[in-house]
């Protein structure tokens, strides 16, 4: 009798050819998690991980010798989930891989007819301008909702919330504190992802502290030094967005400094 994986091949989302922490195994597994969070439904969203490919070495006559003498340095590879597919069903073989010069070095089997994500150029900006190790493009409904709270706003602001401590400050290279005023740029949506490149780059330049960019009526891009950090930051943002929406419903400004905050806590904080 055939096992479940033979009856439904899409359930096989792990390849024994690669380590557990390799992007070919991580990306399908995490895409399924992000789908369950509502970030990747309807084939939306995108995900990428930077991976340091280590050239193999062998021990010979008590000296370490690289197998590949033509390139003596470790190489960075960038793995991307494909576009327009059921993200919860992605397989290890379905990924696109680019080198540090943004040249495609591997792609899915041709018979699958998978497409490269239009998010790739934006991902590469996060890699090159922020030193990211992973980037999530989420279609979170909370990110969309906070972009609509004030449709003239070019920023989302929130302060004095514990989960702000889960957000990395790209300028100070430290995590934010509870009393910090967290500011995230909001850019306008466009018909095609390619049209977002210029405003996205401007947001990165104008907001050196941010680890995310919100796209109005669309979603957000969020990054971190590792996939673990990126995932945790994205979850923290989602919590804060939801919280801000609920606060607005009861007439509380998420960006307002509380009257009863201890003065010592707020020394040096933005007002």
UniProtKB/Swiss-Prot annotation:
Pfam family, one: Aldolase_II
Cofactor note: Binds 1 zinc ion per subunit.
GO MF: methylthioribulose 1-phosphate dehydratase activity; zinc ion binding
Catalytic activity: 5-(methylsulfanyl)-D-ribulose 1-phosphate = 5-methylsulfanyl-2,3-dioxopentyl phosphate + H2O
Top-level EC class: lyase
Matching InterPro entries: Aldolase_II/adducin_N, Aldolase_II/adducin_N_sf, MethylthioRu-1-P_deHdtase_MtnB, Salvage_MtnB_euk
Major site of localization recorded for this protein: cytoplasm
CC annotations in GO: cytoplasm
Pathway: Amino-acid biosynthesis; L-methionine biosynthesis via salvage pathway; L-methionine from S-methyl-5-thio-alpha-D-ribose 1-phosphate: step 2/6
Location(s) in or outside the cell: Cytoplasm
Its EC number(s): 4.2.1.109
SMART domains listed in its UniProt record: Aldolase_II
Record-listed substrate binding positions: 119
Cofactor names: Zn(2+)
GO BP terms in the entry: L-methionine salvage from methylthioadenosine
Binding site for Zn(2+): 137, 139, 218
PANTHER family the UniProt entry points to: METHYLTHIORIBULOSE-1-PHOSPHATE DEHYDRATASE (PTHR10640:SF7)
Protein family: Belongs to the aldolase class II family. MtnB subfamily.
Protein name: Probable methylthioribulose-1-phosphate dehydratase
Organism: Nematostella vectensis (Starlet sea anemone)
